[in-house]
C-alpha cells in the first residue's frame, strides 16, 4: 500500500510535538478534548487530613487525620470512622496525664495523626498521634476496633511534635513463623532529646497489650537501638531537629530521606536565618546497635540552580526503557524525589522545585566508598550534628562489601559529598509537593502533586530526541488551590491514584484517554497509556480495544493514524449522485464493509475495489438543507463508517459549493469554485449552458462589466452639470431591457439620474443638480452606483465616489476660502466678503473674485486673535503661537513679517497653518528696554490692509526659583517634586535637570513646576537647573538632596487577612524620604495597593492590601501572596520583597445572629457571635483587632478562636450589628434589646417600706460609729503629735550628722581619685573570693614535680578541656554523698583557676551546667524561683567565680568608688560616737544588735600626733573620744597618719605604743591595761583617755612597742586569752588580714576577772539572755538607727544607683552581665516560663545575690582595708537591703518586723523600680554576638593567663579524681560519647602514671 500524503494538519502536529517543550502543563483542555470528568472524592469537613495508606489486597483506603482515623472503600465511600481526639492533655506533661498527675493545666488538645502503617501479618493498622507525648493505637483493619494503646512506659512515647508530615516509619515483618516484627521510626523531637530518640528500632509484639511493645530491639547499659540528638547540639542550635520525609526498605537496608538544620551554614544565633539540608539516612535492618548508621547530603542541580529541600520521594522499579537507559536490571530500584529550590524556609519552601531521579545502585556505591575510605583511616566521621564529628576515622583491615553493617568504631558516619540526582523536570510556577511512579508496559510514568492541588502526569524518557528527560503530558485538578500532601498512593490495580489535600481525598484515574476525540489528539498527547482504537474511533488503553492485536486496528504512533483522501474534493449543490473515489491509509481489514457518511446528514453505500472505496455524493434535494444559509460553500466531514462497529473511523473535508449566492460578476468568477457569470441575465451559475447568449458568459474578472477609476468627480451643490464615467465591458441592453442610470446615495435625498452609454467603455450621467442639507459640512463624498435594466448593478471595484461641496460652508474668512482644495471652484468674492463660485460673484473687475490659483492672491485685513504663551524670557527662544484670520496663504507671505515689538520672531514652516496659525521663535530681547510689546504680523508687506497687531501685549519676564519641595528623595528617583518661584510658566518650553539628568516634566503654573526626579549618581546634594527656552535658571542655594534608597528590614506582624486593612508596622531605613509610600500585594494574578503613613526615617505604618480574589483564597493555615512589596517612588528593589515570609489568612467567617436575621436580647446579657477563622494561627503575639458596633456604639470584646463575646452597651431598641477587623466588615444581623419590665404596685410599696426600715437602722449605726470614732481621733492626734516631735528631732540630728560627715568624707577622699583607692591586685582579689580564708593557697605557688607526673598532669589538663569529660567528672562528683558543700565550692574554684586561660571553653561548660541545673530544678518540681538561691552545686559556685573574673575591671572603673565611699562613711560615722571595745556595740549603728542602748557621756578631743615617719614634720591633728580605749586611739591615729596607704603596708596597732607627751621630757606610755586599771567585783575596766585624764589638744606619738615591767608580768595571761580568741576566729572563718581584730578585745577567761569598756556584758558565757543589768531595755534608742541611716543615705543610694545602671560615665555595661542575662532568658523561653517574676528572680539570684552581696558585705575582698565588727554589722544591713530590693515578693511589715527591714522600708520600693528598670534596659540591648563574646573572653584569658599556677590547680583537682576514681571510670564507661572519645582509657593512663610516681 502506498505511503499516505501527509496532510498539512498532520505535519503541523508532528512539528509541534518535536518542538514542544516537554515541560508544559495542560491547564485547560484544548479544542477537541472532552471536559475533565468529575472524580470520586471523600471530603473531611471538620478535621484536617494527614496520612493515607491503601491495602494492597483489598484496595481499601485508610486515612489518618486530626482526631480521626477513617476507613474508606476503594471508591472512597466512608465505611468506618474512629475517634482519636481531642484529649485532655498538655504538651508539658511527661509522662502524660493518663499515667501520672500533671502540675500543668490541661486543655482540650487535638491529636494529629503522624504515622499510619499497615501491619498485614497481624491484620491491624498502626496509627501514631501527637497527643500524650506521641502514643500509638493498634486498630483492627476490618472495623477500626481499638486493639490496644500502649501508653504507660517511656518507650511508648514517640514524640509530642504536632507537625504531621515530619515522621516516617518502616514496618519490618518478622521471620515466617516467629511473628516478631520491628518498627523503624524517625521523628523530630522539638529539643526534647532526653525524652525522645530521633531514630529508633522498636519491637512490635503480636499481643497489643504486651509489656515489651515498642521496646527497643536491643538495649543494654551502653548501647541500644536508638539515636539521640546530643543536648550540646541543641544548646548550640536550639532550633536543630531532624524531619523525616520518606522511608523505605530496600534489600537488607532501611532508608530515610530527612530534612535537618544545616549546622555549617546556620549561625548559632537564634535570631539568624535558618538553612536546611536534605540527607539520606541508611541503616541495616538487622543492626540492633545502630552501628551501620550512615547519612549523606542529597540533592540535585539544574542550570546552576541548587535544589536542596526534599519534599517527597517514591521508590519504584524503572520501566524497561528507563532501566536500559540507566544501565540497570529491570528489578533494580530507583528513587524519584521532589526537591524545592535552595536551603531556606523549610515550612514554606520556594515554589520553584525539581523532580529528580536517583538509582539505589549509585546511592549504595557512594555509601560503600565512604565506609571503605573511613576504614582506611581517611578523614573524620563528619556527622555535623554529633559531638564527635571531628573524631578521626580508624584504620582497620576489614573487608567492606555491599552488605557491610558497621562496627562499634567509625560510626555513626556522615557523608561529605552531596549525592546528586538526575534532574528530570523543573516547575517554577506551581511547586511540586508529592510524587508517585510506576512502570506501564515498559514506560516509566511519574505523578507529581502540586501546591495548587493539581496532579502532573510525567513521562520519563532519557532518550527523548528533544534532549529533555521528561515530558509533562497532562495536568488534572484534584482540588483547586489546596496543596497535595505527601501520601500520593496508587491503587493495587494501578488504575487509580489517591491524592490527598488537607480536606479531601480524590481518586484520580491514572489515564483519561477517553477525553481525546481524535487520533491526532490522542497520540499527540504522548500519554503512554493511550492509543487509537481505529474501527471504534476511540482513544483508550490497548487492553480496552477489541482485537487490538490485529494489524492496524490499534494505533500507538502518530504516523499510524488513518489518512483519507477524496476525489473530487467538492461538488455543486445543484449536482446529484456524483461518483466519489476515496483512498485510505493505515486502515485494518475493511472486508466487513464501510459506508460513506456526510456528517450526520446523509449516508451512502460504498464499494471496495482495488484498495479504493467508491461511493456517491448525496442528491441535490438532500444537499439543499445542508447548504441553506451557509454562503457560497459548506464544508462537511466525509466519514468512513465501519459496518462492523457502526462507528465513523476516518474523515476528510468535503465541500458543497453554491454559485447562485453571488450577486456580482467579480464575486462569481473570482471564487474558488468553477462558477460562470451570465452578464445578460445577471446571475452566477456552475453550469455554462445556463447562459442564454454565448457571448454573455464570463469566466474571468477582466471580462466583467465594471466602472474604472478616472479623475475625481467634484460637483458644486446647486449647479447643473453632466458626469462622465470610464468603464469596461458595459453590456448593450437587449430588446425588452431598460437602459442605464446613475444612483447618487446622498444621505436624506438620494438621486437617480438617467445615464447615456456611449460605448462599452464610456458612460455619462445626464445634466442634473445635487444638494445636501446643512452648512456644517463643506464637502460630502457620496457613493455612486451605475445600474441597468432597473437593478442590474455594474461592479464598482474601486468604490468610485462623487464629491459634493458648498463654497460658503465653514469658510467665513478670505484665508479659509482661498486655502480650500483648489479642485473646488471656490474663490473670495471681495465685494460680498464671502466665499463663492466665480459666476455667483458680481464681476465689477477681475480683482473682485480671488482664487488660490492666482499666485499673487492675498487676503486683506489679517487679524490676531490669540497669543500663546503671553510671556517669555528675554533670552529668546520662545515659540510663540499666533492664532488668527487671513494670516497669509503661503509660508512665504509671512516668512519675515512677524515681530514682537522690535524683536524678530522667525516663523517655523513645519508648524505653519495657512491663514490660521503662525508658530515663530522669538529672538534675543536682552537689549530691549521695554518689559512688554505688541506682536505684529505683516502679510508680504506692512501696508495698512496687510498688517495685524495683537490685542494683548507679549511680556518679557525673568523667571526665578527659590525652593524645592520635598528637598530630598531616594537615589533611585521617581519622587514628585515642586519647584517654587516666579514666572515659571513663561516661554513655550521648559526642561528641568537635577544633577545633570532630566526631571520628567508634568505641569507648571506661574509659581510652580512639577516634575518626577531622575535617578541620582551618588547620595548627596545635586544642583537644579531649569531651561525655559534659551533662559537657563539656577540657584546655588536650592539643591535637591539624594539620600540612600529606603530599605525594609521588618514587617510586624508578618500576616494579614484576605480583606487586608490590618495595621502593619514597617521598620527600615530612610523611609521618610518617600512622601507617599504604598504597600502592594499580588495574589492570583490580581494586584492591589494600600496606603502607608510615615512616622520617621525608621518607622511607618501601613494598612495591608486586600488580596480578595474570586478565583482563589488563602487556606486556613495561611499562604504567601505571589508578591508583596512597597511602591517607594522609583525604588525597584522594594517592589517585591523576596525575603519576606508574609502570610495571608482567610477572612473571619461569622454565623448569622439567628435564622431570621433578628436576635432578641435582654439588657446586660452578653452578645455571642460564633464563627471560625476568628484568630488566624499566626506566629508571634499579634492578634486580629475586632470592633463590634451595636448601631454606632462599640462594645467591650473578648475574642476566642470560635466566638466573639460582646458586652452589649446600655441600649434598647433595634440596632444593626457590624463586625469589623482590618478591611473586613460584616453584619450578622439585627439585635433587638428589650427594656426591663416595670414593677407592680405591691412590689413598689414593699420595696419602699423595706427601704425605709433599712434607712432607720443605718442612721442609728452611723450615730454610734460617730461617737466611737471621735474618741479614736483624739487618741490618734495625740500619738501623731508625739511622732511628729520625735521625727523632727531625728531629722535635725540626721541633718547635723550628715553635714559633719560630708566634711569628714571630703577630707578623707579629697586626695583619693581612682588611683588613691587601695584596690587589691587581680590575683589577691580573685583568691579572696575563690578561696576565702586561705592566705597561701597551692595555686599561687610553683609546684616541683617529677617529669612523668608533670606529663600526666598535662594529659589530665587536656582531658579537662574535653567538655564531655569535664561534665561527666562534675556530674559524677555531685552524685557522691561524701562530696560535701565545701568540696563543691573548692572544685568549682579549682576548675576556674585551671581554666583561667580558656575562658571561652569555661563559659561553655558553665552554660551547660546551668542548663542541666535548670532542667533538674524544674524536673524535681522545685519552685523555679529557688534556682541559684544557694550554693549546692558546682555550677553555682562556678557562676560566682565567673562573674568574679569578668567584673574586676568594672569594679575598678565604676562600682569600686561608691563602695569604698560607703565603707569610709560607715567607718567615719561609727567612730564619731563611742564604740564598746569588748561587745562591739556603738552609739551610731545601722544594726539593732550592735547598738549601745544607754546614755554614754563623752567628749570629742583633738590630739596632735607626731608623724612617726618624720619627727620634724608638722603634727597631724586627729579627732578621738575621751571614752576611747588606748587601742582604739592608736587605730584612729594610724588611720590619720597613714591616710591613703593600703592597710597591709602600714604598722599595726599591736606593734606600736601610744606615748603621751607632756612637754619636752615628760612622756607617758598609755596602755589598755596597766597597774592603774580599775577592778570592781571581778569586773576590770579597760583604760580610756578619760582614765588617763588626757586633755584636748594634747600631743601624742606612736612609737615601736616596748616591754615594761607591767607588760612582762601581765602579757602572758592577756596574750593567752587573746591568742585563744584569735585561734577561734581563724578556724571559724578568715585569715589574719580579714579578721575583725579590733575593737573586740577578749575578756581574760583564765584569771577570773571580766573585762568591760562602756557597758558590762551580762550575756557573757554563763549569763542568761535578757538580763542586761544597767542597759536600758527601752526601744527609744532605736531612733539612733534612723539617724545613722539618714546620715548614710546618699552613700547607699550612690552605690545602688551605680550597680543598677546600664550606663556608667562612659563605661559600657559589662558584656558578662548582658550575656548571662540573655542566657537565662533563653532558658526560660526554652522551658516556656513566661512568669516575669521567675525570670527576675533568676537574674537576681545569678548576679546581685551571688556576687554583689558578697562584695558589699566584704569590701576587704576588693580593697586593701581593715573591717571592724561594727562596720561589718552595718554593711550586713546594707547588703540585706540590697537583697530585698532584688526580690519580687512583697514584704509585709509590722511592729514585730526586724528593725533593719523597717529601717529601709520606704526606700525598697524605689530601689526595686531601679532593679526592674535595670533588667528591662539590659533585655532591650542588642544581643551580644558569639564572635564579640568569644573575642572578649579571649582577651580576658590573655590578660590574666599566668595569674595562677595551672599545674598546681590540676594537682589539686586530681586529688578528687584519686578519691572518686572508680565512680568516675564507671561513669565514663557507661557514657556512649565518652566511649567514642576513649576518655576512660586516657584517664586510666593518667591514674596509672600518678600511682607509679606516688
Curated annotation (Swiss-Prot):
- IPT/TIG domain segment(s): 862-957, 959-1043, 1046-1145, 1148-1234
Topological domain spans for side Cytoplasmic: 1264-1894
Q: Which GO terms describe its cellular component?
A: cytosol; glutamatergic synapse; membrane; nucleoplasm; plasma membrane; semaphorin receptor complex; synapse
Coiled-coil blocks: 1262-1315
Annotated membrane topology is:
Single-pass type I membrane protein
User: What CDD domains would the database entry show?
Assistant: IPT_PCSR, IPT_plexin_repeat1, IPT_plexin_repeat2, IPT_plexin_repeat3, RasGAP_plexin_A, Sema_plexin_A1
Segment forming the signal sequence: 1-27
Give the transmembrane region(s).
1243-1263
Q: Where in the cell is it found?
A: Cell membrane
Q: Which InterPro entries match?
A: Ig-like_fold, Ig_E-set, IPT_dom, Plexin, Plexin-A1_Sema, Plexin_cytoplasmic_RasGAP_dom, Plexin_RBD, Plexin_repeat
A Pfam match: Plexin_RBD
As for what it does, the entry says: Coreceptor for SEMA3A, SEMA3C, SEMA3F and SEMA6D. Necessary for signaling by class 3 semaphorins and subsequent remodeling of the cytoskeleton. Plays a role in axon guidance, invasive growth and cell migration. Class 3 semaphorins bind to a complex composed of a neuropilin and a plexin. The plexin modulates the affinity of the complex for specific semaphorins, and its cytoplasmic domain is required for the activation of down-stream signaling events in the cytoplasm.
The protein, known as: Plexin-A1
Native source species: Mus musculus
Amino acid at each position: 500500500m502506498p505511503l499516505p500524503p501527509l496532510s498539512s494538519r498532520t505535519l503541523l502536529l508532528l512539528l509541534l510535538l518535536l518542538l514542544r517543550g516537554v515541560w508544559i502543563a495542560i491547564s485547560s483542555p484544548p479544542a477537541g478534548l472532552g471536559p475533565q470528568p468529575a472524580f470520586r472524592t471523600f471530603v473531611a469537613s471538620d478535621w484536617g487530613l494527614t496520612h493515607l495508606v491503601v491495602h494492597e489486597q483489598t484496595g481499601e483506603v485508610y486515612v489518618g487525620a486530626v482526631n480521626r482515623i477513617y476507613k474508606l472503600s476503594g471508591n472512597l465511600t466512608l465505611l468506618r470512622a474512629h475517634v482519636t481526639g481531642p484529649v485532655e492533655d498538655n504538651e508539658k506533661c511527661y509522662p502524660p496525664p493518663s499515667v501520672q498527675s500533671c502540675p500543668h493545666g490541661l486543655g482540650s488538645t487535638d491529636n494529629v495523626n503522624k504515622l499510619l502503617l499497615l501491619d498485614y501479618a497481624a491484620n491491624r493498622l498502626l496509627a501514631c498521634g501527637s497527643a500524650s507525648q506521641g502514643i500509638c493505637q493498634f486498630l483492627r483493619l476490618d472495623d477500626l476496633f481499638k486493639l490496644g494503646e500502649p501508653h504507660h512506659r517511656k518507650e511508648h512515647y514517640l514524640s509530642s511534635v504536632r507537625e504531621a508530615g515530619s515522621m516516617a516509619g518502616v514496618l519490618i515483618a518478622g521471620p515466617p513463623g516467629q511473628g516478631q516484627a520491628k518498627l523503624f521510626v524517625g521523628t523530630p523531637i522539638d529539643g526534647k532529646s532526653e525524652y525522645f530518640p530521633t531514630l529508633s528500632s522498636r519491637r512490635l509484639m503480636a499481643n497489643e497489650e504486651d509489656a515489651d511493645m515498642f521496646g527497643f530491639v536491643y538495649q543494654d547499659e551502653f548501647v541500644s537501638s536508638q539515636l539521640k540528638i546530643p543536648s550540646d547540639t541543641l544548646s548550640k542550635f536550639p532550633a536543630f531537629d531532624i524531619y523525616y520525609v520518606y522511608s523505605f526498605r530496600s534489600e537488607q537496608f532501611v532508608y530515610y530521606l530527612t530534612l535537618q538544620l544545616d549546622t555549617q551554614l546556620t549561625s548559632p544565633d537564634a535570631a539568624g536565618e535558618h538553612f536546611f539540608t536534605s540527607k539520606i539516612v541508611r541503616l541495616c535492618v538487622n543492626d540492633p546497635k545502630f552501628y551501620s548508621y550512615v547519612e549523606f547530603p542529597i540533592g540535585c542541580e539544574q542550570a546552576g540552580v541548587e535544589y536542596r529541600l526534599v519534599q517527597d520521594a517514591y521508590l519504584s522499579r524503572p520501566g524497561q526503557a528507563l532501566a536500559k537507559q540507566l544501565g540497570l536490571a529491570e528489578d533494580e530500584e530507583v528513587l524519584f524525589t521532589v526537591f524545592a529550590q535552595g536551603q531556606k524556609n523549610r515550612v514554606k519552601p520556594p515554589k520553584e522545585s525539581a523532580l529528580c531521579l536517583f538509582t539505589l545502585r549509585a546511592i549504595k556505591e557512594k555509601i560503600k566508598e565512604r565506609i571503605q575510605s573511613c576504614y582506611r583511616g581517611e578523614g573524620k566521621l563528619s556527622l555535623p550534628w554529633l559531638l564527635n564529628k571531628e573524631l578521626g576515622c580508624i584504620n582497620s583491615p576489614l573487608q567492606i562489601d555491599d552488605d557491610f553493617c558497621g562496627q562499634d568504631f567509625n560510626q555513626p558516619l556522615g557523608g561529605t559529598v552531596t549525592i546528586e540526582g538526575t534532574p528530570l523536570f523543573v516547575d517554577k510556577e506551581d511547586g511540586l509537593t508529592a510524587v508517585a511512579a510506576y512502570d506501564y508496559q515498559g514506560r516509566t510514568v511519574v505523578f507529581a502533586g502540586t501546591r495548587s492541588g493539581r496532579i502532573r502526569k510525567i513521562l520519563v524518557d532519557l532518550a527523548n530526541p528533544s534532549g529533555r528527560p521528561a515530558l509533562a503530558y497532562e495536568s488534572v485538578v484534584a482540588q483547586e488551590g489546596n496543596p497535595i500532601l505527601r501520601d500520593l498512593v496508587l491503587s493495587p490495580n494501578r488504575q487509580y491514584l489517591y491524592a490527598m489535600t488537607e480536606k479531601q481525598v480524590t481518586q484520580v484515574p491514572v489515564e483519561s484517554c477517553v477525553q481525546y476525540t481524535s487520533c491526532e489528539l490522542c497520540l499527540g498527547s504522548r500519554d503512554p497509556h493511550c492509543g487509537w482504537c481505529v474501527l471504534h474511533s476511540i482513544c483508550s488503553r490497548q487492553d480496552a480495544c477489541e482485537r487490538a492485536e490485529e494489524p492496524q486496528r490499534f494505533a500507538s504512533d502518530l504516523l499510524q493514524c488513518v489518512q483519507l483522501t477524496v476525489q473530487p474534493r467538492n461538488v455543486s449543490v445543484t449536482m446529484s449522485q456524483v461518483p466519489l473515489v476515496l483512498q485510505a491509509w493505515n486502515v485494518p481489514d475493511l472486508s466487513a464493509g464501510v459506508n460513506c457518511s456526510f456528517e450526520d446528514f446523509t449516508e451512502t453505500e460504498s464499494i471496495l475495489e482495488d484498495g479504493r472505496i467508491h461511493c456517491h455524493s448525496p442528491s441535490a434535494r438532500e444537499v439543499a438543507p445542508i447548504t441553506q444559509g451557509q454562503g457560497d460553500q459548506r464544508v462537511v466531514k466525509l466519514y468512513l463508517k465501519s459496518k462492523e462497529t457502526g462507528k465513523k473511523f476516518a474523515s476528510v473535508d468535503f465541500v458543497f459549493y453554491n454559485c447562485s449566492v453571488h450577486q456580482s460578476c467579480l464575486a462569481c468568477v473570482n471564487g474558488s469554485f468553477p462558477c460562470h457569470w451570465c452578464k445578460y441575465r445577471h446571475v452566477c451559475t456552475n453550469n455554462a449552458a445556463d447562459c442564454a447568449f454565448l457571448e454573455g458568459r464570463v469566466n474571468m474578472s477582466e471580462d466583467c462589466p465594471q466602472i474604472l477609476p478616472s479623475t475625481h468627480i467634484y460637483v458644486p451643490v446647486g449647479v447643473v452639470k453632466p458626469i462622465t464615467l470610464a468603464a469596461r465591458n458595459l453590456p448593450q441592453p437587449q430588446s425588452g431591457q431598460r437602459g442605464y442610470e446613475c444612483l447618487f446615495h446622498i444621505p436624506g435625498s438620494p438621486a437617480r439620474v438617467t445615464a447615456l452609454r456611449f460605448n462599452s467603455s464610456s458612460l455619462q450621467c445626464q445634466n442634473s443638480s445635487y444638494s445636501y442639507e446643512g452648512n456644517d459640512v463643506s464637502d460630502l463624498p457620496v457613493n455612486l452606483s451605475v445600474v441597468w435594466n432597473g437593478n442590474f448593478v455594474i461592479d464598482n471595484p474601486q468604490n468610485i465616489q462623487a464629491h459634493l461641496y458648498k463654497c460658503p460652508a465653514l469658510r467665513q474668512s478670505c484665508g479659509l476660502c482661498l486655502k480650500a482644495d483648489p479642485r473646488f471652484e471656490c474663490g473670495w468674492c471681495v465685494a460680498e466678503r464671502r466665499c463663492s463660485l466665480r459666476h455667483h460673484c458680481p464681476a465689477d473687475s477681475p480683482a473682485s473674485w480671488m482664487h488660490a490659483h492666482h499666485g499673487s492672491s492675498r487676503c486683506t485685513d489679517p487679524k490676531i486673535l490669540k497669543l500663546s504663551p503671553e510671556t517669555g524670557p528675554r533670552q529668546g527662544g520662545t515659540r510663540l503661537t499666533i492664532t488668527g484670520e487671513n494670516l497669509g496663504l503661503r509660508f512665504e507671505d509671512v516668512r519675515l513679517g512677524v515681530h514682537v515689538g522690535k524683536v524678530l520672531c522667525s516663523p517655523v514652516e513645519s508648524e505653519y497653518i495657512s491663514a490660521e496659525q503662525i508658530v515663530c521663535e522669538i529672538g534675543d530681547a536682552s537689549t530691549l528696554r521695554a518689559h512688554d510689546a505688541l506682536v505684529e504680523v505683516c502679510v508680504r508687506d506692512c501696508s495698512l490692509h496687510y498688517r495685524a497687531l495683537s490685542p494683548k501685549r507679549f511680556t518679557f519676564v525673568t523667571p526665578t526659583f527659590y525652593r524645592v519641595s520635598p528637598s530630598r528623595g531616594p537615589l533611585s528617583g521617581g519622587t514628585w517634586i515642586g519647584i517654587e518661584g516666579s514666572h515659571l510658566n513663561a516661554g513655550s518650553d521648559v526642561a528641568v535637570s537635577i544633577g545633570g539628568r532630566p526631571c520628567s516634566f508634568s505641569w507648571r503654573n506661574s509659581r510652580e513646576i512639577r516634575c518626577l526626579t531622575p535617578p541620582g549618581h551618588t547620595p548627596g546634594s545635586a544642583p537644579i537647573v531649569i531651561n525655559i527656552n534659551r533662559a537657563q535658571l539656577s540657584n546655588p542655594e536650592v539643591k535637591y538632596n539624594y539620600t540612600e534608597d529606603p530599605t525594609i528590614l521588618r514587617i510586624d506582624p508578618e500576616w494579614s487577612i484576605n480583606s487586608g486593612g490590618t495595621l502593619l508596622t514597617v521598620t527600615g531605613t530612610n523611609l521618610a524620604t518617600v512622601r507617599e509610600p504604598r504597600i502592594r500585594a499580588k495574589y492570583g494574578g490580581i494586584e492591589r495597593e494600600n496606603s502607608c503613613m510615615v512616622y520617621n526615617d525608621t518607622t511607618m505604618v501601613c494598612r495591608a492590601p486586600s488580596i480578595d480574589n474570586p478565583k482563589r483564597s488563602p487556606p486556613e493555615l495561611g499562604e504567601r501572596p505571589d508578591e508583596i512589596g512597597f511602591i517607594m517612588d522609583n525604588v525597584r528593589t522594594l517592589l517585591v520583597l523576596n525575603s519576606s515570609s508574609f502570610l495571608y489568612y482567610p477572612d473571619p467567617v461569622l454565623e448569622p445572629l439567628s435564622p431570621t436575621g433578628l436576635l432578641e436580647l435582654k439588657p446586660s446579657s452578653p452578645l455571642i457571635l460564633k464563627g471560625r477563622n476568628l484568630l488566624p494561627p499566626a506566629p508571634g503575639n499579634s492578634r486580629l483587632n475586632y470592633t463590634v458596633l451595636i448601631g454606632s456604639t462599640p462594645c467591650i470584646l473578648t475574642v476566642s478562636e470560635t466566638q466573639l463575646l460582646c458586652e452589649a452597651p446600655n441600649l434598647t431598641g433595634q440596632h444593626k450589628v457590624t463586625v469589623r477587623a482590618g478591611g473586613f466588615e460584616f453584619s450578622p444581623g439585627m439585635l433587638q434589646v428589650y427594656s426591663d419590665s416595670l414593677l407592680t404596685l405591691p412590689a413598689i410599696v414593699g420595696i419602699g417600706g423595706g427601704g425605709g426600715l433599712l434607712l432607720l437602722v443605718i442612721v442609728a449605726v452611723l450615730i454610734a460609729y460617730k461617737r466611737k470614732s471621735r474618741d479614736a481621733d483624739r487618741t490618734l492626734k495625740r500619738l501623731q503629735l508625739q511622732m511628729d516631735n520625735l521625727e523632727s528631732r531625728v531629722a535635725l540630728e540626721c541633718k547635723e550628722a550628715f553635714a559633719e560627715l560630708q566634711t569628714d568624707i571630703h577630707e578623707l577622699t579629697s586626695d583619693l581619685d581612682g588611683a588613691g583607692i587601695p584596690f587589691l591586685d587581680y590575683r589577691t582579689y580573685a583568691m579572696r573570693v575563690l578561696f576565702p580564708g586561705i592566705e597561701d593557697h597551692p595555686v599561687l605557688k610553683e609546684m616541683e614535680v617529677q617529669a612523668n607526673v608533670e606529663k600526666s598532669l598535662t594529659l589530665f589538663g587536656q582531658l579537662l578541656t574535653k567538655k564531655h569529660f569535664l561534665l561527666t567528672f562534675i556530674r559524677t562528683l555531685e552524685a557522691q554523698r561524701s562530696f560535701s558543700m565545701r568540696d563543691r565550692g573548692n572544685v568549682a574554684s579549682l576548675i576556674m583557676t585551671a581554666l583561667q586561660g580558656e575562658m571561652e571553653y569555661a563559659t561553655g561548660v558553665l552554660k551547660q551546667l546551668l542548663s542541666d541545673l535548670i532542667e533538674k530544678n524544674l524536673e524535681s518540681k522545685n519552685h523555679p524561683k529557688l534556682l541559684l538561691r544557694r550554693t549546692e552545686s558546682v555550677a553555682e559556685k562556678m557562676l560566682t567565680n565567673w562573674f568574679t573574673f569578668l567584673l574586676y575591671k568594672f569594679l575598678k572603673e565604676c562600682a569600686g568608688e561608691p563602695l569604698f565611699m560607703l565603707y569610709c562613711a560607715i567607718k567615719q560615722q561609727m567612730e564619731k560616737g563611742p564604740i564598746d571595745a569588748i561587745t562591739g556595740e556603738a552609739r551610731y549603728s545601722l544594726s539593732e544588735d550592735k547598738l549601745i542602748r544607754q546614755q554614754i557621756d563623752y567628749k570629742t578631743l583633738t590630739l596632735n600626733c607626731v608623724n612617726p615617719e618624720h619627727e620634724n614634720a608638722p603634727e597631724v591633728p586627729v579627732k578621738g573620744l575621751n571614752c576611747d580605749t588606748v587601742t582604739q586611739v592608736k587605730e584612729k591615729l594610724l588611720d590619720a597618719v597613714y591616710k591613703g596607704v593600703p592597710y597591709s603596708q602600714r604598722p599595726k596597732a599591736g606593734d606600736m605604743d601610744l606615748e603621751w607627751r607632756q612637754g619636752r621630757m615628760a612622756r607617758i606610755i598609755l596602755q589598755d591595761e596597766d597597774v592603774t586599771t580599775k577592778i570592781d567585783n571581778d569586773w576590770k575596766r579597760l583604760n580610756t583617755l578619760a582614765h588617763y585624764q588626757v586633755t584636748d589638744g594634747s600631743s601624742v606619738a606612736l612609737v615601736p612597742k616596748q616591754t615594761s615591767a607591767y607588760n612582762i608580768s601581765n602579757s602572758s595571761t592577756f596574750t593567752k586569752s587573746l591568742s585563744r580568741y584569735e585561734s577561734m576566729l581563724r578556724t571559724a572563718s578568715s585569715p589574719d588580714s580579714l579578721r575583725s581584730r579590733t575593737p573586740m578585745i577578749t575578756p581574760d577567761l583564765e584569771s577570773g576577772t571580766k573585762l568591760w569598756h562602756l557597758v558590762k556584758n551580762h550575756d557573757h558565757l554563763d549569763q542568761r539572755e535578757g538580763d542586761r543589768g544597767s542597759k536600758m531595755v527601752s526601744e527609744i534608742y532605736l531612733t539612733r538607727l534612723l539617724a545613722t541611716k539618714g546620715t548614710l543615705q546618699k552613700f547607699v543610694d550612690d552605690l545602688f544607683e551605680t550597680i543598677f545602671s546600664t550606663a556608667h560615665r562612659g563605661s559600657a555595661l559589662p558584656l558578662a552581665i548582658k550575656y548571662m542575662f540573655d542566657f537565662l532568658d533563653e532558658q526560660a523561653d526554652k522551658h516556656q516560663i513566661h512568669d516575669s517574676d521567675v525570670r527576675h528572680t533568676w537574674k537576681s539570684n545569678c548576679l546581685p545575690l551571688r556576687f554583689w552581696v558578697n562584695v558589699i558585705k566584704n569590701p576587704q575582698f576588693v580593697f586593701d582595708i581593715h573591717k571592724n565588727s561594727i562596720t561589718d554589722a552595718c554593711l550586713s544591713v546594707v547588703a540585706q537591703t540590697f537583697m530585698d530590693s532584688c526580690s519580687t515578693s512583697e514584704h509585709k511589715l509590722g511592729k514585730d518586723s526586724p528593725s533593719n527591714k523597717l529601717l529601709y522600708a520606704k526606700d525598697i520600693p524605689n530601689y526595686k523600680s531601679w532593679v526592674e528598670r535595670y533588667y528591662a534596659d539590659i533585655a532591650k540591648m542588642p544581643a551580644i554576638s558569639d564572635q564579640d563574646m568569644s573575642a572578649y573572653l579571649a582577651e580576658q584569658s590573655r590578660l590574666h593567663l599566668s595569674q595562677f599556677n595551672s599545674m598546681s590547680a590540676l594537682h589539686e583537682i586530681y586529688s578528687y579524681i584519686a578519691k572518686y576514681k572508680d565512680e568516675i571510670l564507671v561513669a565514663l564507661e557507661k557514657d556512649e560519647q565518652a566511649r567514642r572519645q576513649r576518655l576512660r582509657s586516657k584517664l586510666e593512663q593518667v591514674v596509672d602514671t600518678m600511682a607509679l610516681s606516688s
